[in-house]
């Protein structure tokens, strides 16, 4: 059994294999769980059938467990976003793009450009929590043990200030996205639930988020000038 705290939620994961315990080191908590999860043998086999490669049962259990957490967390106004979130000067910026477009490259360029002022919160699948404040809302990005192939991230949280929707280009350019563009890009990076109630919970959060956190189309290359284009448009304001 693994007891951890993610996005302010104490979670109990009833695991069969040690992989999960190793993965979640540094996130442990002694608080009473608000969510309890387990993965059945049938769910493991279903996950195996969805994979192109051959993975151990222990690894597949970690994948299944995070997917189940993503769905259960919706009731706590938390969802998983396929993105790389970096913190610069206390503010959070999320890079969204199809796999292979350059999220990791841009993340590393930002780390190089901003040096000690920057850190990666989660390089692959952060948890996003909506915190309502009277007539407004804040969206916090949280690090998790699930950090992708590169293993970039930490057990920390940051307030999201902007989304960058990455597109490859020769000459860098950063422009404000419409809300319709933001919704389209964000939806492509979500785990969509099958249950109606969970889908309604997710849709409400996304609607509020695109009204609260601005999105930008960042046409970028693999050079530092892409960071400067984003910085001049968003970060230094």
Residues of each region from the PLM?
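A noncatalytic interaction/capping subdomain that flanks phosphate/NTP-handling catalytic cores
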Residues: 1-99, 109-118, 127-237
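Hydrophobic positions on the alpha1 helix immediately C-terminal to the Walker A/P-loop
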Residues: 106
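Conserved lysine of the Walker
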Residues: 103
